[in-house]
Amino acid sequence: MKKLVLAVLLSAIIPNGYADNKVTLGGAMVRNTNAAAFASFDYLKETGLWQHALEGNYVYQEKGDTRVRNEGFFSFKENYALTDKGYAIGWLRYDYDEFRNDSNRTSLSVGYGYKLLRTDTTKISNEISVGQMYNNLNWQDVITNSLWFSHKVAKRVTFVNKFLIDFADEQYIRNKTELNYQFDEGIILGVSNLYTKDPVIDNVTTFNIGASF
């Protein structure tokens, strides 16, 4: 019998001056004793020509009494506007996967981003960067391409897709998709899907509740 598992957001405190931020917690549609939990936060602030962006995700999944997924992702990015559409990037990322040979990966890269489209309802940006990645095994060169898409489907409904691919000794693909409904009080209800390939493919869909600030 299917069960719907929802983790409820208890509290969040974010200093004044933040913009376009949200925190969400959620669970997955599960069968029998399978269960999944998901947590994420996004922070975005613009100051003059600078844009500061933080993103974090955590996903945990069990099948029966066996843990099959335990992953974390953290990204800190500084963008500096060069033109109306182009910008320079400085990027620090960390991701953890308990079941990967190199369970910890940290990368530091620089690059260039371009705003492909900006309208009242749709935003598309593409970024490419080069740098160094360190894992449990060694240092290696890495080239990263990311494509970000956001579309306001209706007044209260937003669709977001973030695609990222690393070209290194081993290819890493990550795609996060969200569909959110926002209430007047800042409460968010939504559904999200997280797909990763590194090299094992993992895919989980969760139903989330959260708050925007």
Question: What feature does the model see in each segment?
Answer:
Residues 28-37, 62-70, 97-104, 133-141, ...:
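Solvent-exposed loop/turn segments connecting transmembrane beta-strands
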